[in-house]
């Protein structure tokens, strides 16, 4: 997680959560994170939940690629430690889903790696959270330069009607079917209907 003030990165939050289980060889290969790293640097889930509760304040705009995943992950982590507060914590901040924005602006595929390539952003190591976060911040800056309408996407998550939203919907997010026609040609208020 990056804290950005006036366009400048002022803090990086990058923590491993040690859940007390060994990582699979696939995860180790994909991320480069080892069991030894978790043993030495990993923090408890409770400690990370405490940190997130402090960091996710009402003036937070959480930018994520496929934000439904990140929102669900953070919500359920917080719910295990703050069962009565979790929904308020994640519901009091604003969410910007860059996957929704990219589906309006560029042709398929829409993975973060594709956005990085499309916008010419430098990326060090995919599948490491802090590197993905820095790349996503750079992509978001490019999206803003391309068309200054990102505010219209706040708390709107697009989804493919063929597959639906999934099992869990958050009441503070507006879910809109997002079709693939007219990418890049119409502003979001015409592609994604207003809340």
Task: Outline where the language-model segments fall.
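Conserved non-catalytic scaffold segment of RNase H-like nuclease domains
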Residues: 1-89, 110-127
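Cysteine endopeptidase catalytic domains of the caspase/legumain-like
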Residues: 123-127, 131, 155, 176
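Buried hydrophobic packing segments
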Residues: 74, 101, 136-140
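Acidic active-site catalytic centers that drive phospho-/nucleotidyl reactions
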Residues: 70, 97, 132
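Hydrophobic/aromatic-lined pockets within catalytic cores
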Residues: 78-79, 106, 141-145
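Short alpha-helix plus adjacent loop in nuclease-associated cores
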Residues: 93-108
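Acidic two-metal-ion nuclease catalytic site recognized across multiple nuclease folds
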Residues: 139-195
